[in-house]
Amino acid sequence: MIIIGSGPAGLAAAVYGQRAKLDLVVIEKQMISGGQILNTTEVDNYPGLPGIGGFELGQKFREHAEKLGAPFVTDEITEVRLNEDGTKTVVGSEGSYTAKTLVIASGAEHSLLGVPGEKELTGSGVSYCATCDGNFYRNRVTAVVGGGDVALGDALYLARLCQKVYLIHRRDSFRGAKILEDKVRETENIELVLDSTVEEIRGDGQLKSVLVKNKKSGAESELAIDGLFIAVGIVPESKNFPFLATDERGYVLGDESCETNVPGVYAAGDVRKKQLRQVITAVADGANAVESAVRYLTEQ
């Protein structure tokens, strides 16, 4: 078995794969495991480990897999081939790997604003997941950037926790569901900042404010905030798997078994089309993918 990615889904697959006595390898392009949780200062919704740091949780997952003997390779995937004999070959910058089964746990990358201060303050006030990190800003001032369902939902979620929420959107109308928009407009502690873009994220080691520019007037203003939640889209890491069926956004299609349209290939975690993307659901995917793979191998 080849496991691509060492976020929660890939690491859970490694644990379950080792326990199933599979001959496997985990391929990760980064030197550090954890995936998206590395961007989270604290993870407060993983049962049994309240308040654990995202980096620490990722390392605990990896240590567990390594303790069971799972081998890890640092390599960036460039191509995946489906062979006539049913095996799958993964080609990386450092070498190639062939196995009977493949678990794709490559994750999804949040779209960035691409403004000064964003990368420097990610994890120090800047987040891409309100349900993950919102509770850390209880009774404080936050802002959400975006205009779709996720941004509207994030603003409503944060409004229940925070003193005030700015919702910053580059247009004067939202592209999200009308029912969500109506709720946002009816919520007293949500202030709309429309026709506006974030030009800079400011802070010295910790987020302090954002510089916002009105597109119509050209006027700039600085909003003092404690937390910034960026919800301008997410991009699944599925480009290396053109043989897989995906939805219009690139998420791999598959049910809770994590099976895809290709026998012996499984999609787990954020790369899979699913309703909830959290650490706990990614871990479940990793377990289900291995269970499905074991069943596939047994039937061969």
Residue ranges and their predicted role:
Residues 1-25, 155-159:
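N-terminal Rossmann-like FAD-binding beta1-loop-alpha1 element of flavoenzymes
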